[in-house]
């Protein structure tokens, strides 16, 4: 039996490399990392600062939610998430504001997080800052960089000599 010329999978990278359809060597692999703005704006998982919803941010539904991460991490851990995954210049002030605010009550919604970020960000910079903050927590919650690193290692193992990976 001849192997298929094209295999399309709609799943997370961690699951993709366990698929029986991916046995053997490939001359090319395409990894789509994109999250579309339409997904963010219409999503009810807390991925967007434009839609008020629960602070979940999980793509798959398992693992720690953004709400749990925000409410259980130390100020230093939050700072590192914002700095490393969002490259946010105001990481320290935002981390401090999150920890201060959660002493009053648990942070549960996207609009609560948005309000905290806006409170310590000059108006002209708020949209850009909100984008970086939400990106940082999404990456942390979904372990996106760890998953990508794992996926690239697995993809290289499956590649035929001279094959290509497109990310």
Where are these regions (language model features)?
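S-adenosyl-L-methionine-dependent methyltransferase catalytic core, i.e., the SAM/SAH-binding region
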Residues: 1-166
């Amino acid at each position: 039996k001849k192997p298929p010329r094209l295999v399309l999978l709609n799943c997370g990278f961690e699951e993709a490399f366990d698929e029986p359809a991916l046995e053997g060597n490939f001359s090319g692999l395409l990894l789509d990392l994109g999250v579309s703005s339409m997904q963010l704006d219409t999503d009810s998982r807390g991925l967007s600062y434009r839609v008020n919803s629960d602070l979940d941010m999980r793509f798959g539904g398992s693992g720690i939610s953004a709400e749990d991460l925000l409410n259980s991490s130390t100020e230093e851990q939050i700072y590192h998430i914002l700095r490393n995954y969002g490259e946010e210049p105001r990481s320290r002030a935002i981390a401090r504001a999150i920890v201060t605010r959660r002493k009053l009550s648990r942070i549960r919604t996207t609009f609560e997080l948005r309000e905290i970020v806006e409170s310590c960000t000059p108006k002209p910079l708020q949209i850009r800052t909100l984008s970086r903050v939400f990106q940082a927590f999404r990456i942390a919650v979904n372990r996106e960089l760890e998953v990508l690193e794992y996926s690239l290692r697995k993809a290289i193992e499956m590649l035929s000599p001279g094959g290509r990976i497109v990310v």
